[in-house]
């Protein structure tokens, strides 16, 4: 993700997707589903690793190849590597596994950062949709739980991403002025992120927020820690 190290599909997005993915996995496990968490979390971590631009993801195969290479180094057999990589390449079509549905939903939840809670369309999510997984099983619809999840996700995004005014155009702002301000904010974000070594980035910037403010994220926290 050299093209976008901190932005829409950079490591901030991936870290939030990991938080959301682990919480969703906890919800599924509470409902009696089995979840291959090893494959799921690594697929989330790699799902945008092959991207060369923002917008529609045209590089899923490259991201999947990076995951296959990583799992090969971990000693995983071919069939397992292919299944894990398939969570990336098939995540937008079918969601035929629990893990695929979780990945797609965890990725999509971060769209709230761009569209806002009220502008987010839940049809982006395979979570709680009537999609068959592992036979005819599907997570029952629970509008109240889904709304609570979205509210907590929105709050978490607000606490772990740049303020909207840093990345959105202001009223009557010229395109040139906006680009200059956006570029300055991006450089500041890179400098901030670079202050923490990569090995502590996730825990320091994201997991610690969830734990320190768990009273604001009861649903996310309870299922993340499950």
Locate predicted features.
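His-Asp-centered metal-binding catalytic motifs of divalent-metal-dependent phosphohydrolases/nucleases
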Residues: 35-55, 63, 84-93
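Inter-helical turn/loop segments and adjacent helix faces that build the functional surface
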Residues: 31-32, 71-78
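Short, function-defining helix-loop hinge/capping sites that tune catalysis or transport
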Residues: 55-56, 115
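Short, conserved micro-motifs enriched in small and acidic residues
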Residues: 11, 57-58
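Divalent metal-dependent phosphate-bond-processing catalytic cores, especially two-metal-ion Mg2+/Mn2+ enzymes
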Residues: 3-33, 46, 93-226
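An active-site-proximal "capping" alpha-helix that borders the catalytic cofactor pocket
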Residues: 16-24, 58-73
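Membrane-interface starts of transmembrane alpha-helices
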Residues: 77-85
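Short helix-to-loop capping/linker segments positioned immediately adjacent to catalytic or ligand/cofactor-binding
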Residues: 54, 73-76, 93-96
